[in-house]
């Protein structure tokens, strides 16, 4: 069994990314079986509670107010609607319900109070609850923990070196500080990134190094493939080679054996076979539902059929 480490070097991670694919997947699957249930995939449903109008300028994001896309700003969904969606997600087989707000940061007031009620309601349904809503204060993190929040998502997106090519309205240090506030409050960290934005292999290694040297490692690591959206600065990027996604999943599994590696945005561009390769490489969580915030996702029926065809089952979680 490979030991869990927090001292991975950039060179070691680059070497892993450049390992022959079959050898890499074999090693990742070996690590996976040492630390994870062999044939269980967590189903997580993601709902956009507040869509569009975000003041950040993330180059990939159609929700940014800086770009002219087909995503129009919408009002925040009411608590009742969100909890109804959570009930449907549970009935469909999801064990985690993730809620997203297109905000730069959380602000105190009625909308934050509503968020806390949503978290409490989701947990009362027996689901894990995850929130992604930008930066937050120490006290806000504490209140989310008191409400029962399972995990807070705050992605790093890419390496520190490439980050400035993607966003200028928030620093890398801001993101790391948010992760530390979440961790100090006793909330699990959900943190990953996006590939296919024009970054090099060293940038992918750099992202993974930052994640893998966090102590403890993130509880879950979303690996996203860029979904090019017309109107954003990255709208004309070519689609990612699916094998690059397999490599990222495999290396993430080797570096962070206990994390849930979540195969996230971009799955609609993957064949069934490519998705299975990602599972073989150590991915053990997917977003489950027809939409990911504002981009398409495979329908639930297709995912259920895929899991059945490969003999996998939905991961069951125990919630307090």
UniProtKB/Swiss-Prot annotation:
Record-listed [2Fe-2S] cluster binding positions: 98, 130, 190, 262
EC number(s) reported in the record: 2.8.1.6
UniProt cofactor(s): [4Fe-4S] cluster; [2Fe-2S] cluster
Keyword line: 2Fe-2S, 4Fe-4S, Biotin biosynthesis, Iron, Iron-sulfur, Metal-binding, S-adenosyl-L-methionine, Transferase
Pathway per the UniProt entry: Cofactor biosynthesis; biotin biosynthesis; biotin from 7,8-diaminononanoate: step 2/2
GO biological process terms held by the UniProt record: biotin biosynthetic process
GO molecular function, one term: 4 iron, 4 sulfur cluster binding
Keyword Iron: yes
Coiled-coil segments: none
InterPro entries in alphabetical order: Aldolase_TIM, BATS_dom, Biotin_synth/BioAB, Biotin_synthase, Elp3/MiaA/NifB-like_rSAM, rSAM
Bound cofactor: record note: Binds 1 [4Fe-4S] cluster. The cluster is coordinated with 3 cysteines and an exchangeable S-adenosyl-L-methionine.
SUPFAM superfamilies: Radical SAM enzymes
Any one Pfam family match given in the protein's UniProt record, by short name: Radical_SAM
Reaction(s) catalysed by this chain's protein: (4R,5S)-dethiobiotin + (sulfur carrier)-SH + 2 reduced [2Fe-2S]-[ferredoxin] + 2 S-adenosyl-L-methionine = (sulfur carrier)-H + biotin + 2 5'-deoxyadenosine + 2 L-methionine + 2 oxidized [2Fe-2S]-[ferredoxin]
Binding site for [4Fe-4S] cluster: 54, 58, 61
SMART domains: BATS, Elp3
Family: Belongs to the radical SAM superfamily. Biotin synthase family.
Function: Catalyzes the conversion of dethiobiotin (DTB) to biotin by the insertion of a sulfur atom into dethiobiotin via a radical-based mechanism.
Subunit structure: Homodimer.
Protein name, per record: Biotin synthase
């Amino acid at each position: 069994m490979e030991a869990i480490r927090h001292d991975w070097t950039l060179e070691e991670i680059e070497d892993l990314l450049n390992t022959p694919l079959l050898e890499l997947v074999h090693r990742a699957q070996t690590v996976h079986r040492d630390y994870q249930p062999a044939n269980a995939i967590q189903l997580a449903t993601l709902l956009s509670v507040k869509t569009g109008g975000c003041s950040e300028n993330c180059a990939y994001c159609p929700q940014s107010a800086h770009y002219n896309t087909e995503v129009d700003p919408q009002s925040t969904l009411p608590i009742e609607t969100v909890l109804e969606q959570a009930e449907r997600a549970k009935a469909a087989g999801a064990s985690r319900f993730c809620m997203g707000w297109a905000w730069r940061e959380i602000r105190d007031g009625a909308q934050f109070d509503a968020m806390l009620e949503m978290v409490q309601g989701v947990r009362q349904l027996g689901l894990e609850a995850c929130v992604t809503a930008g930066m937050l204060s120490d006290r806000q993190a504490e209140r989310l923990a008191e409400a029962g929040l399972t995990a807070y998502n705050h992605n790093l997106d890419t390496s520190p070196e490439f980050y400035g090519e993607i966003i200028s309205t928030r620093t890398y240090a801001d993101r790391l500080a948010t992760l530390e506030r979440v961790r100090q409050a006793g909330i699990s960290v959900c943190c990953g990134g996006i590939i296919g934005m024009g970054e090099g292999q060293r940038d992918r290694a750099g992202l993974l190094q930052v994640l893998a040297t966090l102590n403890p490692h993130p509880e879950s690591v979303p690996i996203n493939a860029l979904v090019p959206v017309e109107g954003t600065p990255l709208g004309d990027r070519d689609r990612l080679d699916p094998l690059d996604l397999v490599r990222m999943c495999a290396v993430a599994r080797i570096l962070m054996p206990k994390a849930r590696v979540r195969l996230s945005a971009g799955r609609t561009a993957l064949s069934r076979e490519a998705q299975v390769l990602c599972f073989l490489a150590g991915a053990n969580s997917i977003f489950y539902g027809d939409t990911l915030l504002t981009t398409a996702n495979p329908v639930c029926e297709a995912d259920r059929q895929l899991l059945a065809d490969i003999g996998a089952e939905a991961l069951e979680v125990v919630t307090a």
